[in-house]
Amino acid sequence: MTAALPSTLELLKDVHLGLPVPCHDPARLALLSGHYLYYHYGCDGLDDRGWGCGYRTLQTLCSWPGGQSSGVPGLPALQGALEAMGDKPPGFRGSRNWIGCVEASLCLEHFGGPQGRLCHLPRGVGLRGEEERLYSHFTTGGGPVMVGGDADAQSKALLGICEGPGSEVYVLILDPHYWGTPKNRCELQAAGWVGWQKVKSVFDSNSFYNLCFTRNL
């Protein structure tokens, strides 16, 4: 049996800082503006493994741009808001049902967080054709971008995009599926919980995807 985590953990800020670029002499590189906190499985003492990745990614979005936990709703509050809005049926609060980008955008508006703008990528497209949108987003003050799909239902956040000299495209991924008490960002980087990945290896051709872009109101 895995030991329970403490009820409150010290959340780490801007855990991508210090990562090297994914290729030598990149043609283009764009990173998010502002600051964020890394929310992950169990970071508030609630064992949400297997269903909470969307909520944790949403909490990371809510912590932007100041990188502060004040005002970031907990999982019960997020579920209660979705139930109160009529997006989810009675009894959703306290369940282990996951959420995606559509629910995240509703919660961002409900709680007065950063603005969430949705983008749908059809099955088989991957990120093809959206690289320019991401470059524009990150170079004009945009925050983290939540990603989720159907066949690939593991929510994650995009923090940046990079194009190599040979036209290979990479995205900077923040993975909320970590369980434990991270000591520092170097530990997370070494284990791959935040890092650059090739677009073609991240996006499943059998899945559609939704993206939720965050911006200041």
Curated annotation (Swiss-Prot):
Impact of changing residue 98 to A on the protein? Answer: Does not affect isopeptidase activity
EC numbers for this chain: 3.4.22.-
Which keywords, in A-to-Z order, does the entry hold?
Cytoplasm, Hydrolase, Protease, Thiol protease, Ubl conjugation pathway
Protease as a keyword of this entry, yes or no, is: yes
Top-rank taxon: Eukaryota
GO biological process per UniProt: protein maturation; proteolysis
Is the 4Fe-4S keyword given for this protein? no
| Gene Ontology CC terms, in alphabetical order | cytosol
Q: Fetch the Gene3D superfamilies from UniProt.
A: 3.90.70.130
Tell me the tissue specificity. Answer: Widely expressed. Expressed at higher level in brain, heart, kidney and skeletal muscle.
What does the record list as coiled-coil region(s)?
none
The function of this protein is: Thiol-dependent isopeptidase that specifically mediate the processing of UFM1 precursors as well as the deconjugation of UFM1 from target proteins. Mainly responsible for the maturation of the UFM1 precursor, a prerequisite for conjugation reactions.
What's the protein here called? Answer: Ufm1-specific protease 1
